[in-house]
A protein has these predicted regions:
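Short acidic, glycine/serine/threonine-rich loops at helix termini
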Residues: 30-36, 55-57, 84-87, 115-121, ...
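Active-site diphosphate/adenylate-binding microenvironment
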Residues: 1-63, 226
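Glycine-rich beta-alpha junction loops
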Residues: 24-26, 109-112, 179-184
Length: 231
């Protein structure tokens, strides 16, 4: 699944009074670029602090502050393995105190510390260093169900819409575990020449996912160009 589509599918469905939290990493990129705020929606993220592991705790705090509003957390799998899974236990403990039970933890599951991988490529010209960047695979939906929450796993893009519909209508907190492509570049449209040069050096330096990087990078830039022309 293209990670941009995860947030794009959410944006057209999310209630006007929802609170959205985003963890640090590439999840924050897609939150900023693809979610359209409206109504009384509110958003929260760590900003320039870039603190990993904040997404699920922020969501829990939002539910305590506004127990009558739906909450959505956008979190990477690296942050989930840092502390997010432990925070799901906290969520399960206190969920019955919330007037509106809807609390969705959407996990961008790519088995990669993705933001740092792309920082190495775009800022350091270094190929992905798998020993430090790859993280263990697991089923976050299964873990959620094991502690009394709901869980949905998504592998294909055409499953996303119905999965979001189900998650946003759940009667208790739910984990939406979306397997997504780590090679979609979280690079802004105004990427500098130095960033492009460094990324090219990373490709030439033997990045293990070089071909997919090139394909997804070209697709992303072509889509941005097409949108710009339509505007």
């Amino acid at each position: 699944v293209n990670p941009m589509r995860i947030v794009w599918e959410l944006s057209s469905r999310i209630p006007d009074n929802a609170i959205v939290t985003a963890d640090s990493g590439s999840a924050a990129n897609w939150y900023a670029r693809d979610l359209r705020m409206r109504g009384t929606m509110r958003g929260s993220l760590s900003g320039t602090l870039a603190t990993m592991g904040c997404g699920v705790p922020y969501a829990i705090g939002a539910k305590f502050a506004c127990p009558d509003r739906p909450v959505v957390a956008l979190v990477g799998d690296g942050a989930m393995q840092m502390n997010g899974m432990a925070e799901l236990l906290t969520m399960a403990k206190y969920a019955n105190q919330w007037h509106d039970p809807r609390c969705v933890v959407c996990i961008l599951h790519n088995n990669d510390l993705n933001q740092v991988t792309w920082e190495l490529r775009a800022m350091g010209g270094a190929p992905k260093f798998v020993p430090s960047q790859a993280i263990p695979d697991m089923s976050y939906a299964d873990f959620a169900r094991s502690i009394g929450l709901e869980g949905i796993t998504v592998y294909m893009p055409d499953e996303l819409g119905s999965a979001w519909d189900r998650a946003l209508a759940a009667t208790r907190p739910i984990v939406l575990d979306v397997h997504c492509d780590p090679e979609v570049p979280p690079i802004p449209p105004h990427a500098t020449w130095d960033q492009i040069k460094s990324t090219t050096e990373a490709v030439l330096g033997g990045d293990p996912d070089a071909w997919r990087m090139i394909v997804q990078g070209l697709k992303t830039k072509m889509q941005e160009f097409a949108v710009g022309r339509r505007r």
